[in-house]
């Protein structure tokens, strides 16, 4: 099996490094940009970006979903912000699951309204994620970032129309199960 090294990425599907060269990856914007700089932020020419509410942020004191939504609305006016995310559900870290699910539903709504695909963060919550996907029936593409699950879970997600993005740690059988045009590579670099 020949799996490309992450260090040799031609295109990084998911990174947090703001110094990523334009056209070489999708930079996931941080909460400071979304909450405080959205109205003045300008993308690099030729850059690709994503903006969303990470499930970990739901544990922040004074978490304000409406403030995040206002910031996202401003950022999504830029065509370079081509994805909603990273957003999702994390059973190990973040606010209460009910809050995370409410935020996720709002992010799906935002994605659908803006016509942007979603980058999904999901940790030990694929049952909830699949239920949300079934209930909300999104038309926009969902890509699970940093996928580490097995081939069976990979196939379930693929059958629902989702793509998978693989980082440094992954299950080789899941990689093999995923068609080349439905799998992405990422660094998830800070």
Where are the language model's segments positioned?
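Mid-domain alpha/beta scaffold segments of enzyme catalytic cores
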Residues: 1-190
């Amino acid at each position: 099996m020949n799996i490309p090294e992450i260090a040799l990425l031609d295109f990084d599907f998911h990174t947090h490094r703001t110094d990523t060269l334009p056209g070489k990856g999708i930079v996931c914007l941080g909460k400071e940009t979304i909450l405080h700089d959205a109205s003045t932020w300008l993308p690099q020419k030729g850059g690709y970006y994503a903006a969303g509410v990470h499930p970990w942020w739901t544990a922040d004191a004074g978490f304000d979903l409406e403030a995040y939504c206002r910031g996202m609305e401003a950022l999504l006016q830029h065509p370079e912000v081509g994805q909603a995310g990273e957003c999702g559900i994390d059973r190990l870290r973040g606010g209460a699951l009910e809050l995370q699910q409410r935020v996720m539903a709002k992010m799906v709504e935002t994605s659908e309204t803006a016509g942007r695909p979603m980058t999904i963060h999901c940790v030990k919550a694929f049952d909830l994620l699949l239920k949300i996907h079934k209930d909300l029936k999104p038309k926009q593409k969902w890509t699970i970032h940093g996928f580490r699950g097995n081939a069976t879970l990979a196939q379930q997600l693929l059958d629902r129309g989702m793509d998978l993005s693989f980082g440094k740690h992954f299950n080789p059988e899941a990689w093999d199960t995923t068609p080349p045009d439905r799998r992405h590579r990422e660094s998830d670099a800070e």
